[in-house]
UniProtKB/Swiss-Prot annotation:
Glycosyltransferase in keyword set: no
Family per similarity comment: Belongs to the class-I aminoacyl-tRNA synthetase family. Glutamate--tRNA ligase type 2 subfamily.
Keywords: Aminoacyl-tRNA synthetase, ATP-binding, Cytoplasm, Ligase, Nucleotide-binding, Protein biosynthesis
Broad class of where this protein is predominantly found: cytoplasm
Name listed for the protein in its UniProt record: Glutamate--tRNA ligase
Annotated localization: Cytoplasm
Any one GO BP annotation for this protein: glutamyl-tRNA aminoacylation
NCBIfam families per UniProt: gltX_arch, PRK04156.1
GO cellular component annotations of the record: cytosol
Chain span(s) of sequence motif 'HIGH' region: 106-116
Species assigned in the record: Sulfolobus acidocaldarius (strain ATCC 33909 / DSM 639 / JCM 8929 / NBRC 15157 / NCIMB 11770)
Length: 567
């Protein structure tokens, strides 16, 4: 083997070792070589042997020696590493004093989707970066309007685990009502809150005129008595609320004396976990403010639609003499072409569509479709903390996913709309087909004999000459594929299309489900090579010249159903 080829192998062996803590990998090195010099694939066996030899040598060096070799012989590879580091997307630095504590507070009234997963990923990532704590807090204190779904607690936890998110503490707000009552008593006793007995319409009219409710000046003692009557069920729903005293001259009416707690008729609207145990429930802003303080949250990352909520909650913090957490708010994140509204997704799910329907932008739907968790995280980190709304096209999502799958997914042969042909070859041929182009040493063998029936796509059959991948070159003649030659060089000279094929007597029936958010799910029937039979449910592979698919179901009769991810 020439010196320039040995130098090429040595260069990539050094670079791979230096970027992986001093240990190079033969397969990774060979993959880089074939990517740069594809013509060397014909000498794969020799290349692999040289790679093994030089990788062993490089791995015997310490990291500092590897770096010196790169600096002296291949300095451009160090520059490449520097560029890779600079191009890696990271979250911006934030001010931290002491132990950083973040939280993710989903309402378990539906599944997570790409948009609301953003707060979870960013909050967890900052906790990881700064060696802090991450809290999962279920915001489930509205059993009427945003009623929690019992299954949603587990849906959310399953999605977070899939994303690689681990929480240090799990909290359910509905289990903390006594805590909220105690803080309400403090606010009432200090005159910062009051019990409003006005009708809602009457209060709204007064608020619009910036006029005080007649109950605003009720004594703390009387308010505390009324509050005890509220929590003991002596007031019907809509008859009494606890309001925080703010500024009636504030320009935003919603911030004027907003509601801390209200009566909810849990006989009609029982909580899925607490049932009808509690009669008085905190609003989102009251429960969030109390929990963020009580649980020691120092940093909050959330959508900019919560900006008004922050202003409301600061009133409580100021009254109590607490320091408000550091807050960063970001814009909405949408997946183009998909319904992103939680309420709309919930409506669809309630009609019997599973949360993992591959047409939905739910994390469960994307997962079932073959989108990797690392892809979701990379997209979120790349968008970062931008305050402007962002829309991600599915093509962009697929592009990121493809780069990751390309490195790991097996390449297998599937034929849609198959057409039968008898192969006319002079003698048996043993095809050795690599599972992945980066590793020619791992392959499956398919033995083809003269007269075997071969299945190819009906559109491919329209060409006069073809190359059956890793088998031979053929001429299409009626219902026969007539042997032309064996080598790939002949195919290149004649510009032959290189196609996938399946041997009929070893074929596996395959159903491809191709989801479209608007058109529904298209079903494509075809056949696959025998290796598809050995795939596990949930495994993602690439069907050659077709796209990436994820195994969804394996039937007792041998049929394999897959979901099309993307090209």
């Amino acid at each position: 083997m020439s010196d320039d080829i040995r130098n090429l192998v040595y260069k990539y062996a050094l670079h791979n070792a230096y970027t992986h803590n001093g240990k190079a990998n033969v397969n990774a090195v060979v993959s880089k070589i074939f990517a740069e010099r594809p013509e060397l694939r014909s000498k794969a066996k020799d290349i692999v042997e040289i790679a093994k030899e030089l990788v062993n040598y490089v791995n015997s060096l310490d990291v500092e020696s590897q770096k010196k070799e790169l600096e002296s012989k291949f300095p451009e590879m160090l520059e490449e590493k520097k560029r890779e580091k600079e191009s890696k997307k990271e979250l911006p630095d934030i001010p931290v004093s002491g132990v950083l504590v973040t939280r993710f507070a989903p309402n378990p009234d539906g599944p997570l989707h790409l948009g609301n997963a953003r707060a979870a990923i960013i909050s967890h990532e900052y906790a990881r970066i700064y060696n802090g704590k991450f809290i999962l807090r279920f915001d489930d204190t509205d059993p009427k309007t945003k009623k929690p779904i019992p299954e949603a607690y587990d849906w959310i936890k399953e999605d977070l685990k899939w994303l690689g998110i681990k929480w240090d503490l799990e909290v359910r707000a509905s289990a903390r009502l006594e805590t909220y009552y105690n803080f309400a008593r403090i606010l009432l006793s200090k005159g910062y809150a009051y019990i409003d007995l006005c009708k809602e319409a009457e209060f709204k009219e007064r608020r619009s005129k910036r006029e005080a409710c007649p109950h605003r000046e009720t004594s703390p003692e009387s308010n505390l008595e009324l509050f005890e009557k509220m929590i003991h069920g002596e007031f019907e729903e809509g008859k009494a609320v606890v309001r925080l005293k703010t500024d009636l001259k504030l320009p935003d009416p919603s911030q004027r004396d907003w509601v801390l707690l209200r009566v909810i008729n849990v006989k009609k609207s029982p909580h899925p976990i607490e049932g009808d145990k509690y009669w008085v429930w905190p609003t989102y802003n009251f429960a969030s403010a109390i929990d963020d303080y009580d649980l020691g949250v120092t940093h909050i990352f959330r959508g900019k639609e919560h900006a008004v909520n922050a202003e409301k909650q600061k009133w409580i913090y100021n009254y109590m003499g607490w320091k408000y957490p550091y807050v960063r708010e970001f814009g909405r994140l949408k997946l183009e072409g998909f319904m992103m509204s939680k309420s709309k997704i919930r409506t669809v799910v309630e009609k019997g569509v599973g949360i993992d329907d591959p047409r939905l932008p739910t994390l469960a739907g994307l997962r079932r479709r073959g989108i990797l968790s690392d892809t979701i995280k990379e997209i979120i980190i790349t968008v970062g903390l931008k305050e402007t709304d962002a829309t991600i096209s599915f093509d962009n999502l697929a592009s990121t996913n493809r780069k990751k799958l390309d490195k790991i997914a097996k390449r297998l042969m599937f034929v849609g709309s198959p057409k039968e042909f008898i192969i006319d070859i002079p003698q048996p041929i043993l095809a050795k087909i690599p599972y992945h182009p980066s590793n020619p040493n791992e392959y499956r063998e398919i033995s083809v004999n003269p007269g075997d029936i071969i299945l190819i796509n009906e559109n491919d059959a329209k060409d006069k000459v073809l190359r059956l991948m890793e088998l031979c070159n053929v001429t299409v003649n009626g219902d026969k594929l007539v042997y032309n030659s064996k080598g790939i060089e002949d195919a290149k000279k004649l510009g032959m299309k290189i196609i996938q094929w399946v041997k009929k007597d070893e074929s596996v029936p395959v159903v491809v489900l191709s989801p479209d958010p608007e058109k529904g799910i298209e079903t494509i029937n075809g056949v696959g090579e025998s290796e598809i039979r050995n795939l596990n449910k949930g495994e993602i592979v690439q069907f050659i010249r077709y796209g990436f698919v994820k195994v969804d179901e394996k039937s007792a009769d041998g049929q394999v159903t897959v979901i099309f991810s993307h090209e």
